[in-house]
Design a protein with these regions (language model features):
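N-terminal amphipathic/basic-hydrophobic helices that include classical n-h-c signal peptides
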Residues: 1-21
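Alpha-helical transmembrane segments of multi-pass small-molecule/ion transporters
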Residues: 15-358
Length: 358
């Protein structure tokens, strides 16, 4: 009941933000101005969220029961802002989208699962293998298009691939859970698929209702306060994930360091491999796809499992937040150099690159 009350309160707040006239006046002027300021901070706010989440462990303990609700609201906001016209434009040339979708939803989890089995990691460290498999089977992060746009990359390509990949996850995740996760996962594969489908379908239905009531132009006009609200929800999720970070760091520093190194290694391995595979599509599009594939929506998998995962899996999820939150700051200079470099003959990304947002 508390969870339902919380999600209802946040949903009403989101609807109020969308429905508010701009500029705001009266009682809600100051809160909306604060949300707008927060939403305009860009990648700085993403880093600040992680640091703030680490700094307040007691809030993380309070936030843990609401992880599923936070993920649901983050999905609602993302679906609410999808540009249907952009989706249709990329669907006219689906070959690249289909290849990227197959790579991120089928090839990546298949390779991770096979690698763990062939090297014996699945038997030696089943909880860590579960973490890697949940990461690999997850859809890309819903924030991937926005992060691509922030770096001046092709956000529309990322958006359509994100949508197709997310739609397939309720079908592909149970298969990989059955083949590679075994009894380590407390849920049955069928239950996992149904929970994923329910979360995604519910978020899509709520987002569609908001779009129908207010219209896409109103949502665009309120971009800044919605971004600020999104950051607040992200803080709830990050706090829940990082609740035990400081205590675990003090208790087992070398273990935490090892998990952090692994999290960054997985991130850069997925990024680099994807860029190599799709280099013929253009360097900027290859990097955009690399960003999307390396930023996995582990929160969705955490929501589907309702947090019923082993301690090591929780710790890996916590350490994986560092490459996720630091990626825009780390990779933006590289993306700028990539765009400024001379193009090889025949490579043309013009008119396909979404402009960067400050």
């Amino acid at each position: 009941l508390q969870g339902r009350a919380a999600i209802a309160w946040f949903a009403r707040s989101l609807i109020h933000i969308v429905g508010m006239k701009m500029p705001p006046s009266g009682l809600f002027a100051l809160p909306l101005q604060a949300l707008s300021w927060l939403g305009n901070q860009g990648t700085r706010a993403i880093v600040a969220v992680l640091l703030a989440a680490i700094a307040v462990p007691p809030f993380g303990e309070l936030a843990r029961p609401y992880v599923t609700h936070a993920i649901f609201l983050l999905l609602c906001i993302s679906f609410m802002r999808v540009d249907v016209a952009m989706l249709r434009a990329h669907l006219r040339r689906p070959a690249l989208v289909l290849a990227a979708t197959a790579w991120t939803t089928i090839a990546v989890p298949g390779l991770v699962g096979l690698g763990a089995r062939l090297t014996g990691v699945d038997a030696a460290a089943p909880d860590l293998t579960l973490a890697l498999m949940l990461q690999a089977t997850a859809s890309p992060m819903m924030a991937s298009p926005a992060l691509a746009a922030l770096m001046g990359l092709d956000a529309t390509l990322v958006l359509i691939t994100l949508v197709t990949s997310t739609a397939l996850v309720p079908l592909t995740a149970p298969v990989f859970a059955y083949v590679f996760m075994g009894e380590t996962l407390s849920l049955s594969p069928a239950t996992l698929g149904l929970k994923l489908a329910g979360i995604l379908a519910g978020a899509l239905a709520a987002a569609t209702a908001i779009r129908l009531v207010f219209g896409i132009e109103t949502i665009r006009r309120h971009r800044a306060p919605i971004d600020g609200f999104n950051i607040c929800i992200l803080f709830v999720f990050a706090s829940a994930i990082m609740a035990h970070f400081l205590a675990d760091l003090l208790a087992t520093p070398f273990r935490m360091l090892g998990l952090a190194v692994l999290a960054f290694a997985v991130f850069f391995l997925l990024l680099g491999t994807t860029m190599l595979l799709f280099r013929n599509a253009g360097r900027e599009r290859a990097m955009a796809l690399g960003m999307m594939v390396s930023l996995r929506n582990m929160g969705l998998m955490l929501a589907a499992t309702e947090g019923a995962i082993p301690g090591t899996t929780w710790l890996y999820f916590a350490m994986s937040q560092f490459p996720i939150h630091l990626a825009p700051q780390l990779l933006r200079p590289f993306a700028e150099r990539l765009r400024a470099a001379p193009r090889p003959p025949g490579e043309n990304d013009q008119a396909l690159i979404s402009p960067a947002r400050d």
